[in-house]
């Protein structure tokens, strides 16, 4: 219906489902439905003989590079972009990621290349990104605590820095990320939240509320349905002083313990 609506053509559609094949002569395309990875109508297909998986949105990146293949780009940069993509887009679908990857692996198809819809093509050890997806889908976290804050007159920043110092003194092995939200891209922020075992969120009170940078972040965070992460709120006293109570309520509403 969607294609007909866009192109106004009454083509002879052949609607395929998981396990169906399209004969191309000496090769076949094998189809697997992957709904919500990350669109409802997603599907991947596998090209026999060439052992290529056209993975649609899975295993991709929002990564601008003139190189086509994964072995031709900076590896650290590539995997940062892979993690950012997963964190910001696929986190709510962790259980579906595991289920679909296991379904694909159960087909026992040889795999020489993974071609996502966007980002580099995986030709060097293509299953490495599959293994990472399985790892990330297990409610992933590192030994990291992220402190997120915004500030008006620097007092909330002073609190954030004092908290970071206290954590470091208590546990020097824990990685601490201190992020001033108004100076950081939201997708990078979400990636750090994804990696963290705990977050702390701070804001002063403004008009009986919290700063808009903090409020808008929670709208995004809630939609990602993070699990098994600890959280706490802080804020410098001012105005009517509701910020900590409001942040705690939003943390609870977003699934943080």
Where are these regions (language model features)?
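Catalytic core of the metallo-beta-lactamase
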Residues: 7-72
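FMN-binding flavodoxin-like domain, especially the glycine-rich phosphate-binding loop
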Residues: 65-69, 74-114, 119-121, 162-177, ...
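Glycine-rich phosphate/diphosphate-binding loop of Rossmann-like nucleotide-binding domains
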Residues: 156
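Active-site neighborhood of phospho(di)ester-bond hydrolases with catalytic His/Asp-centered motifs
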Residues: 1, 53-56, 114-118
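Terminal amphipathic helices with adjacent charged low-complexity linkers/tails
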Residues: 112, 116-148
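Short hydrophobic segments within beta-strands
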Residues: 55, 117, 148-150, 179, ...
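Conserved hydrophobic helix-helix packing surfaces used for dimerization/oligomerization
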Residues: 29, 52, 145-147, 231
């Amino acid at each position: 219906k969607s294609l007909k609506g866009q192109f106004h053509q009454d083509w002879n559609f052949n609607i395929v489902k998981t396990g169906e094949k399209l004969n191309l002569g000496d090769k076949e395309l094998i189809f697997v439905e992957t709904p919500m990875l990350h669109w409802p109508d997603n599907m991947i297909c596998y090209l026999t003989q060439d052992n290529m998986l056209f993975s649609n949105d899975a295993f991709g990146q929002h990564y601008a590079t003139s190189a086509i293949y994964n072995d031709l780009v900076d590896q650290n940069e590539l995997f940062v972009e892979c993690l950012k993509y997963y964190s910001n887009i696929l986190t709510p679908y962790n259980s579906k990621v595991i289920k679909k990857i296991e379904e694909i692996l159960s087909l026992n198809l040889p795999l020489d290349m993974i071609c996502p819809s966007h980002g580099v093509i995986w030709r060097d050890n293509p299953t490495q990104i599959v293994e990472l997806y399985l790892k990330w889908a297990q409610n992933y976290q590192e030994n990291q605590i992220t402190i997120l804050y915004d500030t008006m007159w620097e007092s909330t920043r002073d609190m954030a820095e004092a908290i970071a110092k206290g954590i470091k003194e208590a546990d020097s092995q824990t990685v601490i990320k201190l992020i001033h939200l108004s100076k950081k891209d939201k997708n990078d922020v979400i990636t750090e939240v994804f990696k963290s075992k705990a977050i702390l969120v701070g804001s002063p009170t403004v008009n009986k509320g919290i700063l808009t940078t903090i409020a808008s972040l929670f709208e995004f965070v809630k939609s990602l349905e993070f699990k098994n992460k600890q959280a706490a709120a802080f804020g410098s006293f001012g105005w009517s002083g509701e910020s900590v109570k409001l942040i705690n309520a939003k943390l609870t509403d977003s699934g943080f313990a």
